[in-house]
Amino acid sequence: MRLIVTCDDSGSAQGGDFVLQEQIPRNRTSPSPISITQVFVEPKASPASRILYSTLYKERYAICCRLDASVSVYDLEDDEKKLVCHREYVELKGCKPVSLHVFSEFDALVMGLDSGKAALVGFHKNTLEKECQIVDLPGGKPIEAFEACPSQPGVFAYGGKENDLRIVKMFEVGKKVKLLESVEVLFAAKNVKNDHLDLRVPIWITKIRFISSKNSYKLITATRYGQLRIYDTNHGRKPAHDYQVCTNPIITLNFAGSNSDEVIITDNRNMVARHSLVSIDKKAFKTNSATVGDIIKPVPRLLGKYQEGGNTGAIFGVSCFKDTFVATGGLDRYLRVYDLETREMVSKVYMGSQIADILFLEGEEEEESEEEVDEEEENNALWDELESNRPAKKQKQT
């Protein structure tokens, strides 16, 4: 299994082959990486230009956006993952990316920026365009979440602090991406009703994910106040469901593999929890008010937590590999890989740096040759023989 982990402290990343629990020889007691090397190096890289997000481009390149809104491209087929292209855009100075989305079929990538803008960059013949196109998002407020619709290229959703959910269309797609003269607003959400004290409920969206839907846009948002909200544009402008799943800020939101009926969330402490979106506990959240007494709210059923290995800090990087594994990393500098279904930890490695993002490299697993398989079987048979020949302990005579 091959992973690349972006590091906050160095501005680069670390990549390696990792051993899973079921692959550990019998004479060893804990999993460890086969090898770890520094990759995604950029000569000027520093904590001030650290990698925030990384994604694959046509399985050949890794595209990374950095804290200073610069973009780096690396060749994954090169043993050292060499730098192919790096661009710094004057137009984006002072902006921080909140997400990165690659459209490989149209040779383009889009970054959402915290300033309430989006940047479109072309990528042709292994080279990033020298200039990017800036799009001002409706609302004119800062954003913290910016998500692309997987089924409709050019459609995005965004939101932030006191900036409620909007779905917009930014560009048309043909052979190339063509920006619209003005951004078209497809949906603008309304806030939930006032709380039990008749006070306005604050808005602070941290993450957004599109849910597969045929006749409408369906989304789920996470908030700084520990809420999960589900929107259906056919249902109306207010959330179809509003759930209080925790009391801490939710900082990551991911589907559990290909299953969009379950999500994995992390907060700013050490929680990594898996919730169902279809099975609801009607009385799971309970609080008390001096004016109205007990307040009971429904919550998506908690299916379990990924806590083996002792998380001791906020988790910023979460990545699922197909329907098999989920990897996590954050402030405590440990990379942990879990079995997605059983939640058992299969690998834990100290990376020596705070982790921002995790990238699984698909298609890079080398198949074992017949000789390697035969050698492994011989080794296992040898260990079995040694175990069987070990003399039994004599019982003490009384």
Swiss-Prot record:
Q: InterPro entries, per this entry?
A: WD40/YVTN_repeat-like_dom_sf, WD40_repeat_dom_sf, WDR74/Nsa1
Q: Which cysteines are joined by disulfide bonds?
A: none
Gene3D superfamilies reported for this sequence: YVTN repeat-like/Quinoprotein amine dehydrogenase
Residue spans with biased composition (Acidic residues)?
364-379
Where in the cell is the protein located?
Nucleus, Nucleolus
Q: Which domain of life is it from?
A: Eukaryota
Keywords associated with the record: Nucleus, Ribosome biogenesis, rRNA processing
GO annotation, cellular component aspect: nucleolus; preribosome, large subunit precursor
Entry-linked CDD domains: Nsa1 (cd22858)
Instruction: Cite the residue spans of the region called Disordered.
Output: 364-398
**Major place of localization?**
nucleus
GO process terms (BP): ribosomal large subunit biogenesis; rRNA processing
Coiled-coil regions listed: none
Record-stated family: Belongs to the NSA1 family.
Record's function text: Involved in the biogenesis of the 60S ribosomal subunit.
Query: What is annotated about its quaternary structure and interactions?
Result: Component of the pre-66S ribosomal particle.
Tell me the protein's name.
Answer: Ribosome biogenesis protein NSA1
Organism for this UniProt entry: Meyerozyma guilliermondii (strain ATCC 6260 / CBS 566 / DSM 6381 / JCM 1539 / NBRC 10279 / NRRL Y-324) (Yeast)
Q: Source organism lineage?
A: Eukaryota, Fungi, Dikarya, Ascomycota, Saccharomycotina
GN (gene name): NSA1
